[in-house]
A protein has these predicted regions:
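Terminal, regulation- and interaction-focused segments at domain boundaries
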Residues: 1-20, 24-25
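N-terminal intrinsically disordered, cationic/polar leader segments
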Residues: 2-8, 34-38, 42-74
């Protein structure tokens, strides 16, 4: 497989789609399995060893909360 290109994309989901993805993520975390998700046409495999954090940003009247999963590919 070739080297993956850098990318930084955001995908907007409906409430029901987002809830379904969060449920699948929670199930994967509880069972210690990897989490699969497709974002903007690319399937991503999040390993069980990933680190998780919550980030809060505020700028003027706008606020943002991000749930982040980070890992390094071996």
């Amino acid at each position: 497989m070739g080297e993956k290109r850098d990318r930084d994309v955001e995908k907007v989901y409906s409430v029901s789609e987002f809830v379904a993805k969060l449920r699948r993520l929670a199930d994967a975390l509880e069972t210690g399995e990897r989490f699969e998700i497709q974002v903007a046409g690319e399937r991503i495999y999040v390993p069980a060893r990933a680190e998780f954090n919550v980030e809060h940003e505020r700028e003027g009247n706008e606020e943002e909360v991000e749930f982040q999963l980070k890992w390094t590919n071996a």
